[in-house]
Amino acid sequence: MLTLPNERGRFGMFGGKFVPETLMRPLADIERQLYEALADPSFHAEYMHHLYEYSGRPTALTFAKNLTERLGGAKMYFKREDLNHTGAHKINNAIGQALLAKRMGKRKIIAETGAGQHGVAAATVAARFGMECKVFMGEEDVKRQSLNVFRMKLLGAEVIPVTSGNRTLKDATNEAIRYWVEHCDDHFYMIGSVVGPHPYPMMVREFQRIIGEEAREQMLKAEGKLPNTIIACVGGGSNAIGMFHPFLDDDVECIGVEAAGKGVHTTEHAATITKGTKGVIHGSLTYVLQDEHGQIVEPYSISAGLDYPGVGPEHAYLAHIGRVRYESVTDEEAIAALQMTAETEGIIPAIESAHALAKAFQIAPLRSKHETILVCLSGRGDKDVQTVMNYLEGDERK
């Protein structure tokens, strides 16, 4: 399982490269350079140097003592990706891809962003490594995440609002790919999740697996054994695959949590694996939210980082073979979990992470006190305070 994808970029039937002919050469170049870089000890050493010296790794493993006592049942631990520089797991991948771009001689970066965290991470590494950075962001997300938009601009990036479609992450990705098709000779496209054509899903996983590798060591040190259950939120799914991957060959239950929005029985959700069907989106065969004519159905979630109508092809594969269970959590459940975590542990998680927390809170009381649940706290909630405030005042659309 740990050797996938195959040479065609497939995870079982999922993945691959469904792109215009003009992108086949740039993708082949990235793939070749990536394999060379991953086999080069000096590249790995430089990557780890920046993670530790610049981003602040290793991130902590926190025993959620108060929540454990309040909920009863299993002991709960948090892998604290919210403690990274820029406030989320996205920086792990951004540093890796920036170093690859530098290795390829590319000094201009294109990125797409939903919640703004990947955009901030891309802008951050562009500043760090002396690169130009263009960030495509849906106009709706620009409004929802105005703080992150200003952070990107402060960091020297150009933020390009996207006005097509639902004006969210899918549309930002469409525009970023369109721009890359026209400028692939001197631009490097820095995808923020385990989505897109091969080799991106594998590349982003390789730059995020540090999460699970650290957590594995930390849990063994804290408990003397691996966790019984690992839970992470899934939009595109990079924090989840980074968390799950080092445990896939172990007897560890893995649960991915999608955004149920206003309920999976409505049309306002982003539960792609739960409700989607096989299809192609952004160059990859995966599960997609689409109608009977194959048209993309606009997703919805209060979380700007989870309202994506596709999912990483490796997640599609893991769901298909039954290795990972995918469930969903509503806006209401996520916000309640965010409040409970803040009040009980003094940690304000991102709304994305709160989806994973909500599922953990449902499961923990049903488990033995000898079991452990490890939750990936993928990001901090500073960016979401206004959204939560609006929601609690009765208008999440503000």
Swiss-Prot record:
Record has Lyase as a keyword: yes
Positions of modified residues (N6-(pyridoxal phosphate)lysine): K90
Superkingdom to which the source organism belongs: Bacteria
Pathway assigned in UniProt: Amino-acid biosynthesis; L-tryptophan biosynthesis; L-tryptophan from chorismate: step 5/5
S-adenosyl-L-methionine among keywords: no
Pfam families referenced in this protein's UniProt entry, alphabetically: PALP
Cofactor(s) the record lists: pyridoxal 5'-phosphate
GO cellular component: cytoplasm
Reactions this protein catalyses: (1S,2R)-1-C-(indol-3-yl)glycerol 3-phosphate + L-serine = D-glyceraldehyde 3-phosphate + L-tryptophan + H2O
EC number from the UniProt entry: 4.2.1.20
Keyword vocabulary terms for this entry: Amino-acid biosynthesis, Aromatic amino acid biosynthesis, Lyase, Pyridoxal phosphate, Tryptophan biosynthesis
Major enzyme class: lyase
GO MF, one annotated term: tryptophan synthase activity
Family named by the database record: Belongs to the TrpB family.
Function: The beta subunit is responsible for the synthesis of L-tryptophan from indole and L-serine.
Subunit structure: Tetramer of two alpha and two beta chains.
HAMAP family listed in its UniProt record: Trp_synth_beta (MF_00133)
Protein name per its UniProtKB record: Tryptophan synthase beta chain
Organism annotation: Anoxybacillus flavithermus (strain DSM 21510 / WK1)
Organism phylogeny: Bacteria, Bacillati, Bacillota, Bacilli, Bacillales
